[in-house]
């Protein structure tokens, strides 16, 4: 019976280590800055790992008072591009912790 208890303690230590490693990875992700672009780099949106927009850069030559809708579309596309990159990096980083576990939609 003693062997079963030792295995349980070992498993608990592994779980605690994994939890600590996951927390560290999440903190590192939060500090990452990813960029999305649109219009051949005319609009750039920077987003942190928590999906907060931290900067929007619009090149002057794309600003046309006669075509505000195009600029809106470019900002939207660049933002979605940046958010997609955050999702990709998050899945890549956190996926190593959930590999082999059946936990759909966790990250």
Curated annotation (Swiss-Prot):
Record keywords, A-Z: Cytoplasm, DNA-binding
Alphabetical list of SUPFAM superfamilies matching this protein: YbaB-like
Record's GO cellular component terms: bacterial nucleoid; cytosol
Disordered: region residues: 1-27
Keyword set includes Ligase: no
InterPro entries recorded: YbaB-like_sf, YbaB/EbfC
Comp. bias (Low complexity): 8-17
Pfam families named among the record's database cross-references: YbaB_DNA_bd
Cellular location(s): Cytoplasm, Nucleoid
GO molecular function, one term: DNA binding
Chief subcellular location: cytoplasm
UniProt biased composition (Basic and acidic residues): 18-27
Superkingdom field: Bacteria
Record function comment: Binds to DNA and alters its conformation. May be involved in regulation of gene expression, nucleoid organization and DNA protection.
Family annotation (NCBIfam families): DNA_YbaB_EbfC
The protein's assembly and partners: Homodimer.
Family from the record: Belongs to the YbaB/EbfC family.
Stated name of the protein: Nucleoid-associated protein BLi00029/BL02358
């Amino acid at each position: 019976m003693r062997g079963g208890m030792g295995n349980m303690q070992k498993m608990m230590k592994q779980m605690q280590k994994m939890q600590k490693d996951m927390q560290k990875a999440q903190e590192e992700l939060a500090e990452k800055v990813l960029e999305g672009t649109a219009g051949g780099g005319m609009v750039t949106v920077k987003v942190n790992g928590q999906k907060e927009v931290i900067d929007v850069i619009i090149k002057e030559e794309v600003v046309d008072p006669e075509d505000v809708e195009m600029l809106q579309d470019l900002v939207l596309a660049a933002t979605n591009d940046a958010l997609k990159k955050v999702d990709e990096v998050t899945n890549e980083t956190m996926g190593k912790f959930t590999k082999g576990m059946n936990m759909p939609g966790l990250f």
